[in-house]
């Protein structure tokens, strides 16, 4: 792992951290057993196969 050679100022640290933004999970519509649900894209296949209980929220 890379280690810094010098101490980074508080202002530089905070401005660097401020660039990072969390993105909301994109929800995709899927129809399972005649009902429409919105699930994250990474769970789309599992929802179609019935591996996820979509009624439980």
Swiss-Prot record:
Keywords: Ribonucleoprotein, Ribosomal protein. The keyword Ribosomal protein applies. It comes from the Bacteria. Residues 1-19 have a biased composition (Basic residues). One of its GO terms (cellular component) is large ribosomal subunit. InterPro entries: Ribosomal_bL32, Ribosomal_zn-bd. Residues 1-20 are annotated as: Disordered. One of its GO terms (biological process) is translation. One of its GO terms (molecular function) is structural constituent of ribosome. The keyword Thylakoid does not apply. HAMAP family: Ribosomal_bL32. Belongs to the bacterial ribosomal protein bL32 family. This is Large ribosomal subunit protein bL32. It comes from Mycobacterium leprae (strain TN). The lineage of its organism: Bacteria, Bacillati, Actinomycetota, Actinomycetes, Mycobacteriales.
């Amino acid at each position: 792992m890379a280690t810094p050679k010098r101490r980074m100022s508080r202002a530089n640290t905070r401005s660097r951290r401020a660039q990072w933004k969390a993105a909301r999970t994109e929800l995709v519509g899927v129809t399972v057993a005649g009902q429409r649900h919105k699930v994250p894209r990474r769970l789309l296949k599992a929802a179609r196969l019935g591996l996820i209980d979509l009624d439980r929220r």
